Amino acid sequence: MTIDRTYPIFTVRWLAVHGLAVPTVSFLGSISAMQFIQR
């Protein structure tokens, strides 16, 4: 019966993980792109 309390936490945690993962992937992608452009 704790679905109402667990679901919002899971949603916030899911949004936080994606919110941190997307900028990290784009940041690593830009670094790798700069490395390939320099070489």
Curated annotation (Swiss-Prot):
Against Pfam families, the record matches this protein to: Cytochrom_B559
* Cited NCBIfam families: cyt_b559_beta
GN (gene name): psbF
The reply to whether DNA repair figures as a keyword in the UniProt entry is no
Oligomeric state and interaction partners are given as: Heterodimer of an alpha subunit and a beta subunit. PSII is composed of 1 copy each of membrane proteins PsbA, PsbB, PsbC, PsbD, PsbE, PsbF, PsbH, PsbI, PsbJ, PsbK, PsbL, PsbM, PsbT, PsbX, PsbY, PsbZ, Psb30/Ycf12, at least 3 peripheral proteins of the oxygen-evolving complex and a large number of cofactors. It forms dimeric complexes.
* Segments traversing the membrane: 14-30
Q: What name is this protein filed under?
A: Cytochrome b559 subunit beta
Subcellular location per the Swiss-Prot or TrEMBL entry: Plastid, Chloroplast thylakoid membrane
Q: How is the cofactor bound?
A: With its partner (PsbE) binds heme. PSII binds additional chlorophylls, carotenoids and specific lipids.
Q: Which domain of life is it from?
A: Eukaryota
> What role is this protein assigned?
This b-type cytochrome is tightly associated with the reaction center of photosystem II (PSII). PSII is a light-driven water:plastoquinone oxidoreductase that uses light energy to abstract electrons from H(2)O, generating O(2) and a proton gradient subsequently used for ATP formation. It consists of a core antenna complex that captures photons, and an electron transfer chain that converts photonic excitation into a charge separation.
Gene Ontology molecular function: electron transfer activity; heme binding; iron ion binding
Q: Which residues bind heme?
A: H18
Please name the SUPFAM superfamilies in this protein's record.
Answer: Cytochrome b559 subunits
Q: Which GO terms describe its biological process?
A: photosynthetic electron transport chain
Q: Which GO terms describe its cellular component?
A: chloroplast; chloroplast thylakoid membrane; photosystem II reaction center; plastid
Q: Which cofactor does it need?
A: heme b
* Membrane-topology annotation of the record: Single-pass membrane protein
InterPro entries in the cross-refs = PSII_cyt_b559_bsu, PSII_cyt_b559_CS, PSII_cyt_b559_N
Cite the entry's keywords alphabetically. Answer: Chloroplast, Electron transport, Heme, Iron, Membrane, Metal-binding, Photosynthesis, Photosystem II, Plastid, Thylakoid, Transmembrane, Transmembrane helix, Transport
The primary site where this protein sits is plastid
| Organism for this UniProt entry | Arabidopsis thaliana (Mouse-ear cress)
Family membership, please give it.
Answer: Belongs to the PsbE/PsbF family.
